[in-house]
Amino acid sequence: QIEQELPVAGDRWPWGDPHRYPHRPHPVGGNGEIFLRGTRALGIEARVGPVAIANGRFGNRPHCIYRGFCLQGCKVNAKASPLITHVPDALAHGAEVRADSMVTRIAIDRESGRALGVHYVRDGRERFQRAAMVAVAGYSIETPRLLLNSACSRFPHGVGNDFDQVGRYLMVQGAPQTAGRFDAEVRMYKAPPPEVSTEQFYETDPARDFQRGFSIQTVSPLPITWAEHVAAQGHWGGALREYMSDYVHWACLGALCEFLPQPGNRVTLAEEKDRYGLPVADFSYSQCDNDRAQAKAAQSVMEDILHAAGAGEVITIQRYAHLVGGARMAGDQHSGVVDQFCRSFAVPNLYITDGSVLPTQGAANPALTIMAVAARAADQLAAGARSGSAS
C-alpha cells in the first residue's frame, strides 16, 4: 500500500519478500556503476533501488530530473516526503496542523485508565485538547520521554510503564561509510543516495562469528559531509583542501548493520529541565561484541567491493544511523509497550505510531516499515471509530 502511495521505484527485489515495485528503476549514476562493477567481480548480487522517487509522472509530481543533491530536498518534488504526500491528503480531508506546539503530558482518567486528551503549550499558553483516541509519534527519544513525563496516580512510573518497559531497547544501526578514489570522475552526488543495494549479507550466517547481518548501499555524502569524513581521518589544512578538490573522483558505500536490542540501552528522565519545566531525556547506550563484529565485517566487504571496482585509496568513517525502539511492540505488557497494532497494553485508546515501536532494528532503512506499521495502526483505529469502540 505505502509503496503504491509514494510511489517506490526499483528493480525486482530478490531478498526477504521478493516482489516488483510500482515504478521501474532509475538510471544508474557513477557511484552505482562502480558498486555494480565491484559486486559483479566478487559474485555479490545487487539491485537498483528501491527509492521513493517518481520515475515518471505521478499525480502532480514530475519525473526525477537527476540534478543531484537529493539530501537537501527536491526542487521538482519528484522525491516523496510527508510534506508532498500524506500531509496534503490529510489536510484535504479535514486534518488540522497546530504548528509550534509542545505536548507536555497525556491526560489519563483515574478510574478507567483511558486517555482523555493531551496538555500542550502553544504561543506561551497551556492548553488542553480532549480526544477520543490519542496517537503519539514523537519518535524514539521524545515518545518515551512523554510517556514518562505523563506519570499520574494511575501510572505513577509513567504511562504504560508498570513493568519498566518504556524507554528500553533503543537501537541504532551501525552505519560505517567507506569511500574509494578512482582516476575517472564519479560525481557521486548525481543520483539518489541509496541508488544500488545488496542484502546478500542480511541474514544470520553460521559461518560468521556474529548473529544477524548487514546491507550495503551506495551513499553520496555532499561536500560538507565529505569534508567531515576527511577531517575525521586526521587530514587538515592543505591535505583537506586537496581531498575536497578531488571530491568528484570519489565513490562512497554505506552499510546498515543490525545492532541487537539490549534492555540497558534506554531513555530515562534526567534532572535537567527544558524551557517548559519538563525533565529532558537521558540516553544510555552501549554496544555489545556482536555489534562490533558486524560493523567490522561490513567495512571489510565494502573495502573489497571498492578495490574490486578499481579503487586506489580507500578510507572509512565509523558512524551510526536510524534510532528506533523505546516503546517496543511485544506479545504482552511484561515485555513491551504496545501490541501488534501499536495499541498501548495499558491504555486502550492510546496508540504509538513511530519508530519507537520496532522490536528489532533490521539492516535496511526503516522509513517504509515505520510508515507501513503506522498505516496498519490507522486502519485499526479507524475501524474502532466506525464500530464505536473508540469512545
Model regions and ranges:
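Generic, well-ordered alpha-helical scaffold segments in large soluble proteins
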Residues: Q1-E5, G38, L42, D89, ...
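Conserved redox-cofactor binding core of oxidoreductases
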Residues: Q1-V103, L323-R328
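Surface-exposed helix-capping loop/turn segments at secondary-structure junctions
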Residues: Q4-W15, L42-E45, D109, R187, ...
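Hydrophobic (often cysteine-bearing) scaffold residues that line and stabilize catalytic clefts
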Residues: V28-N31, K79, L83, Q294-A298, ...
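FAD cofactor-binding and catalytic pocket of flavoenzymes
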Residues: E33, F163-D282, S335, F345, ...
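A glycine-rich dinucleotide-binding beta-alpha-beta segment and adjacent secondary-structure elements
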Residues: G49, F58-C70, N77, T104-D109, ...
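Glycine-rich loop(s) and the adjacent beta-strand/alpha-helix scaffold that form part
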Residues: V76, A92, S101, R105-E111, ...
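A conserved FAD-binding loop/helix module that cradles the flavin
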Residues: T360-L381
